[in-house]
Amino acid sequence: MTATNNIVNLYQPFLDYALTKLKEELELQPYPIPSGFEHKVAMTGKGKKQQEVQTTSYAHCSPKLRQIRAAHVQGGSALQVLNFVIFPHLNYDLPFFGADLVSLPGGHLIALDMQPLFRDNLQYQKKYTEPIWETFQKHQKYLPWGGDFPEEATPFFSPAFLWTRPQKTELVETRVFEAFKDYLQAYLIFVKQTEQITNSEKLAEIKEAQLRYLRYRAEKDPARKMLTRFYGHEWTEEYIHGFLFDLERKLALNPA
C-alpha cells in the first residue's frame, strides 16, 4: 500500500474498531440521522487538482448513552477527518468521549479526551480523570503536547487531554491508534460502572453542564469553515445544530 493510500484511508480502521467494540460491549440501537446528512459529496479544486470530498455520518445510542456519533470526512490525500463523540444521557454524570482526528498535507492534529462535565470538581476528577492518568502519561511520552490551544476551551477538557501534532503518518497509524483504543476502552469501563443519578439538583447541574458544552462546541466548531466551503452555509449550520450537537433541538421537542 502506498503512502498516499495510507493517508486516504487513515481513519477507517479507527472508525471500524470503535463501531465493532461498541457493538460488542453495549446494547446499541440506531440513532436517527436527519435526512440529507447520512452521506454528502462535493467536488473541490479544478483540473488535475479536482478532488471529491465525502462526508459520512454514523449514529447509535444505548441505555446510558444518548448519542454515539461519528463524522468521517474523506478528501483524498489533502484531507482526512474523523470526529467521534459520545454524549451520555442526562441522568448520568459521565464525561463525553471526544476524538478529533485531522490530517492535512502539513501534518496531523489529534485530540483525545474524556471531556468533563465538571472539570474543576476534585471529586469528579478523582472519579473520571485519575483512573486514566496512567494511560495518558503512557501515550504522552510518544505524543507530546501539541502547543497552542484556546484558553476559553480549557473548562471543556480534562487534565488527561491528549493533544498532539505528529508529523509522521506512521505515528497516527500506531501510537495514536493505540491511544484511541485505550481511551475508548477506559470510557466503556466508566459506562459500565456508572449509576443513574436521581438527585434533582444534581440532574439540573448535569443538564446545564451538557448544554454549556454543546453550545460552546456548536459555536466554535473548527470544521464549520471547511464544511461551509464544501457544502454551503445552510447545510453546514443544520448539520452542526441538527445532528452533531443536537441536544437543544431534542430538548425543545421533549423537555427533560
From Swiss-Prot:
Keywords: Oxidoreductase. It catalyses: (3Z)-phycoerythrobilin + oxidized 2[4Fe-4S]-[ferredoxin] = 15,16-dihydrobiliverdin + reduced 2[4Fe-4S]-[ferredoxin] + 2 H(+). Its EC number is 1.3.7.3. GO terms for biological process: phytochromobilin biosynthetic process. One of its GO terms (molecular function) is phycoerythrobilin:ferredoxin oxidoreductase activity. Pfam families: Fe_bilin_red. InterPro entries: Ferredoxin-dep_bilin_Rdtase, Phycoerythrobilin_Fdx_Rdtase. Belongs to the HY2 family. Catalyzes the two-electron reduction of the C2 and C3(1) diene system of 15,16-dihydrobiliverdin. PANTHER family: PHYTOCHROMOBILIN:FERREDOXIN OXIDOREDUCTASE, CHLOROPLASTIC. NCBIfam families: PRK13250.1. This is Phycoerythrobilin:ferredoxin oxidoreductase. It comes from Trichodesmium erythraeum (strain IMS101). The lineage of its organism: Bacteria, Bacillati, Cyanobacteriota, Cyanophyceae, Oscillatoriophycideae.
